Amino acid sequence: SATEINIYNSVNKGVIDRIYRILEVGLRIRLLNISRFPEIPVVLCVISGKSYPYAGFGISCNTSMISAICKSIDESVSIRTMSHWARSSEKVDCNNFDWVQELPDHMHLYANWKDSPIVEKLMQTDFPKVDAVYYTKSFSEEPCLFLKQLVGYLDTHGYKVYWKDLTLPEVRHLGVVSKIIIPKLIPLSQSQNIRWLGNLHPNPTKAIVNQYPHPFA
């Protein structure tokens, strides 16, 4: 489940400066850690306002919580900038989402969707709170152990994972290089508008799990 990152407890200058600039112009911001693994945070940033563009999303994964926060905020702000630049006079359909196929479509949808129920749910739900701090043990400190745990988790959910440690002994003290292949997740095309292969088990479809378009599906 997601946890809310307490933006008011950060002592990092980069985080404080970004949040101050956003709040200063009357926008709302919420940061959520949506990662399943505490060693590697995945930060979702939601910025919303009372005028166009109504909402923008940014997401970042990093072994450093602070880096993930800063990158997700930067992405969300960039989306708002692009929304201003690419604004269209055409009204978007907020009831039928068949037209939402590519990433720019998601940008236009949430930029034009005033009082979006999914945005309001993200902004108002009472998530458990965590501080915006570095994790005490990062993936880079014990990568092989973490990879073994992750491979085991994916295997129980029907995903075969093949990986190999490619790190040269003389540079191991600087970090680790691993090659990872998950056949079921390899896209048939690198184009952004082509769906990735998912689990072949008879799980509920995305439309049943979440009726709203999601740029990170």
Name the predicted role of every residue range:
Residues S1-A217:
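Helix-biased "structured C-terminal domain" signature
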